[in-house]
Curated annotation (Swiss-Prot):
One of its GO terms (cellular component) is outer membrane-bounded periplasmic space. InterPro entries: CusB-like_dom_1 (IPR043602), CusB_D23 (IPR032317), MFP_Efflux (IPR051160), RND_pump_MFP (IPR006143). Residues 313-397 are annotated as: Required for growth on efflux drugs. Residues 172-397 are annotated as: Interaction with AcrB. The keyword Signal applies. Pfam families: CusB_dom_1, HlyD_D23. GO terms for biological process: alkane transport; bile acid and bile salt transport; fatty acid transport; response to antibiotic; response to toxic substance; response to xenobiotic stimulus; xenobiotic detoxification by transmembrane export across the cell outer membrane; xenobiotic transport. It is a lipid-anchor. This is Multidrug efflux pump subunit AcrA. Residues 1-24 form the signal peptide. A lipid is attached at residue 25 (S-diacylglycerol cysteine). AcrA-AcrB-AcrZ-TolC is a drug efflux protein complex with broad substrate specificity that uses the proton motive force to export substrates. This subunit may act as an adapter protein that links AcrB and TolC stably together. It is elongated in shape, being long enough to span the periplasm. The gene is acrA.
């Protein structure tokens, strides 16, 4: 006898009724759940004054550079400086053998004395003939000749004086001096070397390091944008000069601030960039020519800047920046923007947003354009939490 008993008709009816009731409840709950609006975190856009800075690569260069070359030929007798030391303008660096130049100077002085004596005699003759002019003892022709001889003698004195001065200058050039104050590098010649006037090789190089120049490059497009923003009043500079700060290659901020001096007049055709030159105090000679640095250029003050947290900005496959904005009807819409520059953890937005717009910065993955949402304002205290909790996805177009 089979001990398994079948289901009675009544039991089957009860089971079907219960199943239908449960299905109806699930559908109702699903419908109620679908009607709930997703919650998103938003920030309300506002304008604020912002100092706009740009970080550009650059290299240092000496304020002045003097290549020391001999102006007379001769043998180097002595070097009078320590390589790598700081020197003052006018100090003696090398001594060239002065013997021949001293002799030339002495000879020139002797020729001058002879010329002066001849000029004195010629003048005495003119004076004597002048008294006798008109008498039978001297003719007009003789007087004119004496006068011409005196003038020639005076000209010879002038030439002799010039020869003395030239000899004196050449003698002084045997003492090679520094034309500027600064730090002198290595010597390219030693004692006993023969040097020549106007030679191609410098004896040494002196560089003035305080102040010091920093040459940075900026794209011509950014340069034109900066000029346009300054012209139309979007950016404002104090005293018409932009301040510049430096970050050295080891990541340390240079203690002295500088100012932008000028921009080059031509654009590099290869790179499309333009050179800007800033000047910095360098009293301790911390900066040396040729060092790589990063210059932070204060472009100016934007009195009505709009900053948006970076987690609220997404990029299309083409690289265009967009944000999700909650409208007055609490519906989400996509808004294209121009994010020109990163400022900390925010984007500087120059186009596409205005004060009062509500930008979604958390819960982006839960919404799409046209969906009605429950917007919750994100404050500064929980903005970091929102940033870590919601990573923006790339918009697709």
């Amino acid at each position: 006898m089979n001990k398994n008993r079948g289901f009675t008709p009544l039991a089957v009816v009860l089971m079907l009724s219960g199943s239908l009731a449960l299905t109806g409840c699930d559908d109702k709950q699903a419908q109620q759940g679908g009607q709930q609006m997703p919650a998103v975190g938003v920030v309300t856009v506002k304008t604020e004054p912002l100092q706009i800075t740009t970080e550009l690569p650059g290299r240092t260069s000496a304020y002045r550079i003097a290549e020391v070359r001999p102006q007379v030929s001769g043998i180097i007798l002595k070097r009078n400086f320590k390589e790598g030391s700081d020197i003052e303008a006018g100090v003696s660096l090398y001594q060239i053998d002065p013997a021949t130049y001293q002799a030339t100077y002495d000879s020139a002085k002797g020729d001058l004395a002879k010329a002066q004596a001849a000029a004195n005699i010629a003048q005495l003759t003119v004076n004597r003939y002048q008294k006798l002019l008109g008498t039978q003892y001297i003719s007009k022709q003789e007087y004119d000749q004496a006068l011409a001889d005196a003038q020639q003698a005076n000209a010879a004195v002038t030439a002799a004086k010039a020869a003395v001065e030239t000899a004196r200058i050449n003698l002084a050039y045997t003492k090679v001096t520094s034309p500027i104050s600064g730090r002198i590098g290595k010597s390219n010649v030693t004692e006993g070397a023969l040097v020549q006037n106007g030679q191609a090789t410098a004896l040494a190089t002196v560089q003035q390091l305080d102040p010091i120049y920093v040459d940075v490059t900026q794209s011509s497009n950014d340069f034109l944008r900066l000029k346009q923003e300054l012209a139309n009043g979007t950016l404002k500079q104090e005293n018409g000069k932009a301040k510049v700060s430096l970050i050295t290659s080891d990541g340390i901020k240079f203690p002295q601030d500088g100012t932008l001096e000028f921009s080059d007049v031509t654009v590099d055709q290869t790179t499309g960039s333009i050179t800007l030159r800033a000047i910095f105090p360098n009293p301790d000679h911390t900066l040396l020519p040729g060092m790589f640095v990063r210059a932070r250029l204060e472009e100016g003050l934007n009195p009505n800047a709009i900053l948006v947290p970076q987690q609220g900005v997404t990029r299309t496959p083409r690289g265009d920046a967009t944000v999700l904005v909650v409208g007055a009807d609490d519906k989400v819409e996509t808004r294209p923007i121009v994010a020109s520059q990163a400022i900390g953890d925010k984007w500087l937005v120059t186009e596409g947003l205005k004060a009062g717009d509500r930008v979604v910065i958390s819960g982006l993955q839960k919404v799409r354009p046209g969906v009605q949402v429950k917007a919750q304002e994100v404050t500064a205290d929980n903005n970091q939490q929102a940033a870590s909790g919601a990573q923006p996805e790339q918009s697709k177009s």
